[in-house]
Amino acid sequence: MIIYATEVQTINSFVRLESLKEVYGFIWIFVPIFSLVLGIITGVLVIVWLEREISAGIQQRIGPEYAGPLGILQALADGTKLLFKEDLRPSRGNTPLFSIGPSIAVISILLSYSIIPFSNHLVLADLNIGIFLWIAISSIAPIGLLMSGYGSNNKYSFLGGLRAAAQSISYEIPLTLCVLSISLLSNSLSTVDIVEAQSKYGFWGWNLWRQPIGFIIFLISSLAECERLPFDLPEAEEELIAGYQTEYSGIKFGLFYVASYLNLLISSLFVTVLYLGGWNISIPHISILKLFEGDQIFGTTIGIFITLAKTYLFLFISIATRWTLPRLRMDQLLNLGWKFLLPISLGNLLLTTSFQLFSL
């Protein structure tokens, strides 16, 4: 009987151990997702603070300085204030569309972060069709903006939603053609493979030098997709009050505010991944894996730092552009997208295809 009781106790301990493994395995699935979301939120807070400080410097004023040291907690204070404001809804609007619109805009942008490699294989989902997934997901956000404009039952909101949809369609196609050119050069649609294809020759191996025309078109299209000046026609204050955001208040207005900065950050990250070598350092024939082969954690940290440094360089350019160039008219914006960027990006794709065929 003693031997039988011991066997039962041993079996029960194994069962408990297996159940604990299942629980820990289930929890471990959410650890990378939680870490990524926490990093994204921190990045957005830093971007908001940087934009306010840079804008203040350009305009020769002080900028935020009371909320935390150097005003770094100002964005957090603004978000807390919006969280506790009343959520108003238009009495004659379409309530389901009005409520769902901001969530669609934010979620579609957040999903794009899952394929960004921040360092060597430090990516949430390394997919073989990662670039196509980003293009597909990014085309969902304008649907949310159009739903918000239509559901508000306001002429300014509806016009803002229509402008957002027209602008997104106009610049999504040139951007996609530029991405296809990069995929042809790298022989892959995976973001990790695209970064590794630029690692051999260091600084001179970046796609920036192999695709200068595509880089400029991608840069312009990214700013237009983010609805940043000079492409902020969907929410032009002088014309449409606040565009599709006119009827929003409280947390829903805050979601649109966060979505614009999330979009700016993801566009900057894709500029880094596609054209600026990603996590790679700029020394030819030296990779982070070989340089920090003995300390993988330190090498990964250096890779993250390099990726973010390149990303914030593009962010600085986009913020400076906001206070440099005037807003375009709607006809000028559409003409730029359809009559200039689309033919040039198509010619760039054909040129890249011809080069790849002749180099075989």
From Swiss-Prot:
One of its GO terms (cellular component) is chloroplast thylakoid membrane. Its main location: plastid. One of its GO terms (molecular function) is oxidoreductase activity, acting on NAD(P)H, quinone or similar compound as acceptor. GO terms for biological process: aerobic respiration; photosynthesis, light reaction. It catalyses: a plastoquinone + NADH + (n+1) H(+)(in) = a plastoquinol + NAD(+) + n H(+)(out); a plastoquinone + NADPH + (n+1) H(+)(in) = a plastoquinol + NADP(+) + n H(+)(out). Pfam families: NADHdh (PF00146). Disulfide bonds: none annotated. The chain crosses the membrane at residues 27-47, 98-118, 129-149, 165-185, 203-223, 253-273, 297-317, 340-360. It is a multi-pass membrane protein. Keywords: Chloroplast, Membrane, NAD, NADP, Plastid, Plastoquinone, Quinone, Thylakoid, Translocase, Transmembrane, Transmembrane helix. It is found in: Plastid, Chloroplast thylakoid membrane. NCBIfam families: PRK06076.1-2. NDH shuttles electrons from NAD(P)H:plastoquinone, via FMN and iron-sulfur (Fe-S) centers, to quinones in the photosynthetic chain and possibly in a chloroplast respiratory chain. The immediate electron acceptor for the enzyme in this species is believed to be plastoquinone. Couples the redox reaction to proton translocation, and thus conserves the redox energy in a proton gradient. Belongs to the complex I subunit 1 family. NDH is composed of at least 16 different subunits, 5 of which are encoded in the nucleus. This is NAD(P)H-quinone oxidoreductase subunit 1, chloroplastic. It comes from Lobularia maritima (Sweet alyssum).
